[in-house]
Amino acid sequence: MKLYANNKCLDLSVPQIMGILNFTPDSFSDSGQFFSLDKALFQVEKMLEEGATIIDIGGESTRPNADEVSEQEELHRVVPVVEAVRNRFDCWISVDSSKAVVMREAANVGMDLINDIRALQEPNALETAVKLALPVCIMHMQGQPRTMQANPYYENVVQDVLAFLQKRTNECLSAGIKKENLIWDMGFGFGKSVQHNYQLLQNLNEFCQIGYPVLAGLSRKSMIGAVLDKPVDQRIIGSAAGALIAVQKGAKILRVHDVAATSDMLKVWQATANA
């Protein structure tokens, strides 16, 4: 299983680490501490040295109750960072956006992967993704970030999320997205209760069996905090445990804040798998 973009290849026969760079003043985890270009580049270098192969750049906070960001503001935040990272590093660059214009402009300066929490459902997003012909991660979310955690309900969360991803995948394929360019994300924490999240994690292998690489993003989220009863900055070990379970069940990309801890975990897991 491999991804290709811009003359680069990402080998998914081993799990890959996607390091999170929130270029926003209001992210739930890092509270804007990398909200300057110099700090952002320093953080990117650190994450790459620690073992990340993908850097995921986001200009809109998608935490619960987050305010939406205008197209112009998101462009202003994201495009210069993508360009600066591309000029300096040879890593994979993912952009966490649902806006067609952001996808297009980011691709012009070196983006390799579209990471869309709204699964290409915003205006012109699907058509833009088809034209760009880059790998794209589609995610399940019930509602929108502002309201998604208001009593989420499912008949069966595993089957409901699976049905959405299969339906959306078929729509993407019909529109012209190549099968080998699709990645699935179950959307931990996006319109799900703590119980829903753990049911999805427990059954993550069902999603992997369909044949698309699965991205797991549960780093520092409330599903970890609820079990540990610890604030965001004290969820590193819990997040690594969740990531390990995801990998054991077949996840191929781990979207994380704490790259070093995740990389150490993967090395021990790999040594065991190879024994």
Curated annotation (Swiss-Prot):
Role: Catalyzes the condensation of para-aminobenzoate (pABA) with 6-hydroxymethyl-7,8-dihydropterin diphosphate (DHPt-PP) to form 7,8-dihydropteroate (H2Pte), the immediate precursor of folate derivatives.
Residue intervals of the Pterin-binding domain: 15-267
EC numbers for this chain: 2.5.1.15
Pathways involved: Cofactor biosynthesis; tetrahydrofolate biosynthesis; 7,8-dihydrofolate from 2-amino-4-hydroxy-6-hydroxymethyl-7,8-dihydropteridine diphosphate and 4-aminobenzoate: step 1/2
Protein name, per record: Dihydropteroate synthase
GO molecular function, one term: dihydropteroate synthase activity
UniProt KW keywords: Folate biosynthesis, Magnesium, Metal-binding, Transferase
Organism (species): Haemophilus influenzae (strain ATCC 51907 / DSM 11121 / KW20 / Rd)
